[in-house]
Amino acid sequence: MLSPKKTKYRKQHRGRLKGACSRGNRISFGKFAIQALEPAWITSGQIEAGRRAITRTTRRGIKIWIRIFPDKPITKKPADTRMGSGKGDPKFWVAVVKPGRMLYEMGRISESVARKAAQNVAYKMCLHTRFVKI
């Protein structure tokens, strides 16, 4: 699963999911893409599940670009712990996704197979997506 090798700080504020995506909202590498239509946090496990769904649907000869990276740590306190005593330890990593962001791009593949792969990825994601082509 994806996670940063090294970060400047172990913990981050939660932040807010406001506005639309201004970077990463165009197709840059492949011919087809999967675009987010709503804001969400996508975990590294969900990103990997989407990648597996694409590779299983398309089999050989496809090129996949993952356009998001989980660089935000999410902390959790242990169960049965009283309030206070600081923030919890980092448990998993998420990518902050805003509407318009390209999640995956695909190349060297027919449009019909790419559409089927995009549909399979949509089942794995926690947000609404759409299929985009050049």
From Swiss-Prot:
Segments spanning the bilayer are none
Q: Quote the protein name from its UniProt record.
A: Large ribosomal subunit protein uL16c
A GO MF term? structural constituent of ribosome
Q: Which GO terms describe its cellular component?
A: chloroplast; mitochondrial large ribosomal subunit
Into which family does the record put it?
A: Belongs to the universal ribosomal protein uL16 family.
Assembly and interaction partners: Part of the 50S ribosomal subunit.
- Give the location in the cell: Plastid, Chloroplast
**Alphabetized InterPro entries for the sequence:** Ribosomal_uL16, Ribosomal_uL16_bact-type, Ribosomal_uL16_CS, Ribosomal_uL16_dom, Ribosomal_uL16_sf
GO biological process annotations for this chain's record? mitochondrial translation
Q: Which key words are in the record? A: Chloroplast, Plastid, Ribonucleoprotein, Ribosomal protein
Disulfide partners: none
Q: Which species is the source of this protein?
A: Gnetum parvifolium
The cross-references to SUPFAM superfamilies, in alphabetical order and at most eight, read:
Ribosomal protein L16p/L10e
For this protein, the record's CDD domains field holds: Ribosomal_L16_L10e
